[in-house]
């Protein structure tokens, strides 16, 4: 070759080397790919707007895009590179999404033997995990493959000759503004920025939404030696694949450099727009109407079920004969304003009591729970029978309502509440002797009616001050028939079990059962309670004063019976008060046969006849004995104290409460 030609060839070769060196040093930057020097294969293509689409929504497909010129890694120079790209994964409507995208370096642009699906178009079953592959990749994976030990279906991973990542992390970015990591959904369809920096020893990977600066903290930072993976001549590019589920994989822009310092920034404003598939308007409208219809139907069914359950009741065939005495739960719920606390009147062993208002009058609604069906028919029959009782000194019981697990009893509302509120809770006005005597006469008249004048004999079995209600005129009315039992006149009652309240219970209850004389005993205790202003049992007082019956008798023995009266009654009619105290002792005689019946009691209170001649030392007067349970020797009493304990039963529909 002529010397002149040699010189020309040397100059051309030198200039070419300078060009290649400059190209390798400075790298490239594409804000869209209209003029991008890319090689694409598979289903990958550059769209007219400059958007690189690696895959469309076809199934079982793969697509690659390479920078045409290979990267030359000189062993004498540090093995380093940096890249910044923007990608987006857009799902097909109604599809959960396909596989992901990988940024990678490969010794060849020929990946025709690579598989789609979970292999991301980089490997196949043979080349995966093969050191001879010499493929380094950063995967943005949206499918969790157990085969590759993926951590989840939305992660970033570092892959070296295998899709089993050497390190991975859930897709997220560090928010410098808030100082914490925020998750990113790779399949959201939004554009995502990715930075990959390798300085020869440490690999850093960062993510961020479009429009946010590169985070100060990397998502993944790992010390790595890539000298055995990256060969002298490598191609750089992107790969994506679809399986049975498919979506569009897009690259909007890409900047690459062998040096982090010389990496050019992408111009976000020049990036192409990502198309999002739109449903047809008619189909969207139809689906919207269907969804709205389903929501409306669910709301209507829910409202119906709520309303039905809210007012649901339990009704059985045998209850038809008691229909006039039954209230609907809905009417009681509305009458009490949903059992609002403002109408709460009190709470006792039977349950809670609320004031209610019906169109005709005010009512009191007592609600309490029940379990089981034993004796239910008898219980409701007795409620209906009590609704037929008619006496001015009985609280009128209007009827009932029955729900699953709950009873409601409806009675007339008593404005002044119960007698015990005035005796023991300083409720005003203070009860004068004339009012107290009038209350006792009224209750005595009511018991006389129950025992002798009603269609059946009615045993109340729970006479006490808290069950005596007062109307606006302080007329006493006996209420709370939850323990009441009925039997025909002349028949022997068959009640069993000692039920009631300590101090009001006749000592013969457990051995002989309830009778009219046990009601008389309880009324005698009530007489002493009203006259003395003390409860029948006061365990906190000195032992000689704890039992009211015994203490009143002791006062009489000391010839100071009047000292037992309520101190609030000083100056009242002493002879009349003493007579009433003696009547209380007579009614609480230990021997049932020695107690008067209620006919006599009414006559004594009305002073139609005089009390029989007896003294505090007469048999059975002022004597209190413990109550035996079931006729056994088990005494419901503490031996060191004369105070008998309270015995109570919940309602068991026919066997007591």
UniProtKB/Swiss-Prot annotation:
The keyword Iron does not apply. One of its GO terms (cellular component) is plasma membrane. Glycans are attached at residues 74, 124, 181, 204, 225. Its main location: membrane. It is an enzyme of class 2 (transferase). One of its GO terms (biological process) is defense response to fungus. Residues 25-257 are annotated as: Legume-lectin like. SMART domains: S_TKc. Pfam families: Lectin_legB, Pkinase. Keywords: ATP-binding, Cell membrane, Glycoprotein, Kinase, Lectin, Membrane, Nucleotide-binding, Plant defense, Receptor, Serine/threonine-protein kinase, Signal, Transferase, Transmembrane, Transmembrane helix. This is L-type lectin-domain containing receptor kinase I.8. The gene is LECRK18.
